[in-house]
Amino acid sequence: MLGADTNILVRLIVRDDDPQCRMIEELMVSERLFVSLSVILETEWVLRSSYRQSRIEIAAALTELTAVESLIFEARGDLLWALDRYAAGADMGDMIHLISNRDMPAFVTLDRKLSAQAGPDTPLPIRTLA
């Protein structure tokens, strides 16, 4: 298994460079690629800021990639939850922070909106200090 960089996911989603897409697809025939949560976070930022994609487009594209057999996503189940919350209006960074801390007893924040954005199925309790 190899670790995948952000540009790998971006190419697979936007498909704006045929030779690079072919190289990635050929590699994925023989290798599995690990996608970390930090790569997901940067991919969201690139798609939003450079490619002007909407949160709905981004969430749908990333969700679709989680079904690709040769892509192994860190905390896949939690990531799907985060993508669902992101599509509903939550901040992607905040959702990644929550799932990255899923083994902690609680997540502490000063952000009063975070609990509402995370919804009732958050992977850990959120404690707001304000």
Residue ranges and their predicted role:
Residues 85, 98-130:
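Acidic, PIN/NYN-like endoribonuclease modules and their adjacent C-terminal/linker elements
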Residues 30-33, 70, 102-106:
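Short active-site oxyanion
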